[in-house]
Amino acid sequence: MEIALACDLIIASENARFALPEPRVGLAALAGGMQRLPRQIGMKNAMGMMLTGRHVGASEAKELGIVNEVVPQPELMDAARRWAKEIEACSPMSIRATKQVAYQSLGEANLEKSMQGQYSAVSDLLKSEDFVEGPVAFA
């Protein structure tokens, strides 16, 4: 699950299960799971999973916000490709800027400060053809 938590999106089959089971065997989720899970699903939900090593099924993982979509196993690759096509249809520079701001602003607790932050991908976007052409496409 630690690798999955590092992903931007998760599309899961109905039979997928998620857990950080390390405490059950005297270990700890040292590959980022203990830091990422609380940020993604809130402290109480994360502690409930992390302190018990409890497994959650795909439907509960969707409710908690761990996964974006749950599909039947035979449809998994089609769903992943659909998400990829939707992202691919967007401006690469906009995607880069969105990801940079979203992830870097996690480190700033103050929303106003994070909104005033300087982000290189945003600066690059504002100077790009995408920024000029984008509004024209909406007109």
Could you describe each region identified by the protein language model?
Residues M49-M50, T98-V101, F138:
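Short alpha-helical scaffolding segments that buttress acidic/His motifs in well-ordered protein cores
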Residues G42, G57, P72-E75:
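Short loop/turn segments at beta->alpha junctions
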Residues R54-E60:
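Acidic, divalent-metal-coordinating active-site segment for phosphoryl/phosphodiester hydrolysis
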Residues M1-L51, L64, A79, W83:
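CoA-thioester-processing core
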